[in-house]
Amino acid sequence: QFTTLGQNITALEVDGTFDDCQALVKSAFMDEELNRHMKLTSANSINVARFLPQSFYYFNAYAQLDKIGKADQLVVSVPSGNFGNITAGLFAHRMGLPIKRFVAANNRNDVFLEYLHTGVYTPRPSVPTIANAMDVGDPSNFARILDLYGKNGNPHAEISQLISGYRFTDEEIGATMKQVYNETGYVLDPHGADRK
């Protein structure tokens, strides 16, 4: 993934899942001894500075649709792994962007879909899929979503009114990729195909 590295960057290979890597990063952030000697930051959506700028393209998409008269009743489908992208969209919504509904597209790692159905959040180990950037069993941004919508004491009701969820199998994702290619000649990545 890295073609050149600065002197302050070291790439490490971890024998584990995204959740394992995320746990290591969070542990490093909490390590007082390590933090006395190094200044640490994360390049993924644990860091709000990573996903907050993503809220701008929701505004941009709305503006483009508004120009052609199609902005009313806007529904946005978002591939959902660690929930940084959809959290950025929810921030945009809180800032006043009139998005009617969000769809959290999940692969087999569907802890958020389960939460929408039951009101109970149950993290679990992730399983590998062809949409591997979404292979997250405990999305760190779920806590931010709860914080955004938990002020009335019933975050599940408020979240469920704004966000729907769907789960797609590897077979469905592959079929969508094939269909889009056959119809348009465009090679769709598995994460985009997860939002059909």
Can you name each region flagged by the protein language model?
Residues 1-196:
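PLP-dependent amino-acid enzyme catalytic core
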